[in-house]
Amino acid sequence: GKSNLALQGIYMVAEPSVGRTEGRDDYTQYGLFHHFTCNFSVDENGFNHVDALEGQIGFTKYGKVQVGEVTMSAWFGIEDTAEAVIYHYSDSQTELTPYPMKESINPDGTISPFMIHAKYAAGDIDGVPYSSKGLAPANGCQATQARNPVSYTGMITYMHKLGGHYCGTTSWDLFYRQLMMIIKYA
């Protein structure tokens, strides 16, 4: 496919990293595609909070913390034409991007200036799920380190041990990852 930028004569390259060799990603110069690793929390009202950014005092990737990737909120649109399915992605609402990314919508209906996606699969520490580095995923596997494997039906109860507004991977998390793959590598 061709991006809108390509149609304007602006060509960007995204090459995946291989092993320890970082790939090229021209997209990161744009806010929509630039991520910052953070510690985050979700309050009792369902609002996301960035508690610390990587490099700041108090930030850690290990232990009883939630590690995520924060980026600016975005809007999207999808056109299904006879020739192709066209995805639109923008930092603002337009005719082509009428829908906010779900993870950008606050519980009160306002649009957050940022959205957060977990960086790591949830692992178990003392019976509570944490998205932190080095944990075996609590995904139903029988690994000794997983302690309390989680089933599909038990995910809601398990994630709510952190608070009533925490959840596991959602269809919107998957849509975001797929959308980034389509935009950058299609």
Where are the language model's segments positioned?
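Short, solvent-exposed loop/turn elements at domain surfaces
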Residues: 77-83, 124-128
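Short aromatic-cysteine micro-motif
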Residues: 90-186
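Hydrophobic structural segments
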Residues: 69, 85-88, 103-104
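Conserved hydrophobic ligand-interaction patch in extracellular adhesion modules
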Residues: 1-78, 141-186
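Long, low-complexity, polar/charged, intrinsically disordered or flexibly structured peripheral segments
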Residues: 83-86, 117
